[in-house]
Amino acid sequence: MKKLKNLFLILLLWFYPLRSEPINEGAYILEEIGDVLRFLPIFVGTVSLAMRDYRGLGELAVGTLVTQGVIYGLKGAFSNAHKDGVRVGFAKRPCCNSWRGMPSGHAGGVFSAAGFVYYRYGWKPALPVIALAILTDASRVVAGQHTILQVTIGSLIAWGFAYLFTSRYKPKQWMLYPEISSDFKGSSRYGVSFSYQW
């Protein structure tokens, strides 16, 4: 578990972006929250892994990767279209002279996780994840990185791919797993445990 935690922290620091300076301290804090929450698929995937829902973890990975691929493909297409003289004002970031604002990658990431939880585990567990996803979208707008249209389109793309790639979770009635323990004398014990739910 400690190795997994260290690996997560290393990945978080490695992928941490260079950020623009927002208008005020409140917007800066909100932007930081949004930057951390874009890793929501990793957090949700960790929960699926802890539940031993390997199929769900795979579906989350596929949905998130396809979403990000489509979003970054669209960003590149709109940027190239602008260079070729096509009017794509909706793709311009509000903060700067960048034409890679449509759709929002942060919104796509967090709504991949939210859509996955909704379609895999149901609406009740999805409520807090959806709230965090909406907070991330708001952080991108307040920070001046995206318009409302850009985060909405990114969110809808992610939700659509979550719908396509996610199946309903059906817990297994039985489990077979290895058991390793030691007794009070320090001797190791190895075995196999079987459990069945009625």
Regions found by a protein language model. Give the residues of each.
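Alpha-helical transmembrane segments that form the membrane-embedded catalytic/substrate-binding core
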Residues: 106-110, 146-166
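Hydrophobic alpha-helical bundle signature of multipass membrane enzymes
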Residues: 2-6, 11-102, 108-141
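Outer-membrane beta-barrel architecture
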Residues: 112-116, 160, 193-195
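Outer-membrane beta-barrel "beta-signal"
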Residues: 186-198
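Transmembrane beta-strand segments that form the barrel wall of outer-membrane beta-barrel proteins
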Residues: 173-183
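Outer-membrane beta-barrel proteins
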Residues: 47-52, 121, 163-173, 196-198
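Transmembrane helix-loop junctions in multipass membrane proteins, especially transporters and channels
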Residues: 79-84, 145, 149, 170-175
